């Protein structure tokens, strides 16, 4: 094989390695973002649940969730 052929193959190999490394970085970043989103969402839910429980506790009722951002309090929760 000539020098030119070897240089072309080497260049193609380097380009392939560089692009596959970039793709792996994008995939890793996407997975990290998904994990962070789930973590933030669970913190928000926990805070909302605690607020609902505190609000209903004042009325001596049970927190059944939220509707339109407001806590739903009742003696017994159905469903």
From Swiss-Prot:
Residues 21-44 form a propeptide. GO terms for cellular component: extracellular region. It holds the Pfam family Conotoxin. Disulfide bonds join 52-64, 56-73, 63-77. GO terms for molecular function: ion channel inhibitor activity; toxin activity. Its main location: secreted. InterPro entries: Conotoxin. The modification Leucine amide is found at residue 78. It comes from the Eukaryota. Belongs to the conotoxin O3 superfamily. The presence of a 'disulfide through disulfide knot' structurally defines this protein as a knottin. The cysteine framework is VI/VII (C-C-CC-C-C). This is Conotoxin ArMSGL-0124. It comes from Conus arenatus. The lineage of its organism: Eukaryota, Metazoa, Spiralia, Lophotrochozoa, Mollusca.
